[in-house]
Amino acid sequence: MNVFLTYLIIAFLASNPTEAKKGTQTISGTITASGSYCGGVAPSNEMLQETQAKRPMSGFMVYVKKGTENKLLSCIVDSTCTDSKGNYSFDLRPGKYVLLQKEQLNKNIFETYKSSKSIQVDHDCMQLWWKKGLTSITVGNESIDSLNFHFQKRCFVPLSIPCLRYIGHYPP
């Protein structure tokens, strides 16, 4: 029933875009990533700088839930995908929101990533990371721009999950 009402509201707002835009503020920013040297033949300074350079993350999904922290049963109120330059934007009514990435939408992340011979998981860190999301924002009477995020690629672990540490052997 809840899902039906959510779809009904979304359909109404989509059918009347001028009404939906009224009273909203635009939230926008850029998402970037940079790499790390992960062993093997030592790179030249030029190659190392190239690896560590910030690059836009295209296709990165940002989800929005109402409230100041992520809750499992909270509904997603908006989402957006970064463009080829890593830019994203969405329109929100005044209020408090938490921004999330895909891995923070449900608690499967705790089953997906468990400690192993080569990965160490900080469970307290994972709980806090899941709860806090990417960030929380308060939307008032003005738009929020330059809400930027940067991910440093660490060796042999997923890019955007900060609570994992590689403890295995590095390539010679």
Identify the residue ranges that each predicted region occupies:
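Sec-dependent signal peptide recognition
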Residues: M1-I9
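Bacterial Sec-dependent signal peptides at the C-terminal "C-region" and cleavage site
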Residues: L8-G23
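A short, amphipathic beta-strand motif
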Residues: Q25-A33, G39, F149
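Short, ordered, surface-exposed loop/turn motifs in non-cytosolic proteins
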Residues: S34-C75, P94, C163-L164, P171-P172
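Short beta-strand segments within Ig-like beta-sandwich modules, predominantly Fibronectin type-III
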Residues: D78-T82
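Short, surface-exposed beta-strand/beta-hairpin micro-motifs centered on an aromatic residue
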Residues: D83-D91
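A short tyrosine-centered beta-strand micro-motif
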Residues: R93-Q101
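Structured interaction patches on ligand/partner-binding surfaces of diverse proteins
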Residues: L105-Q152
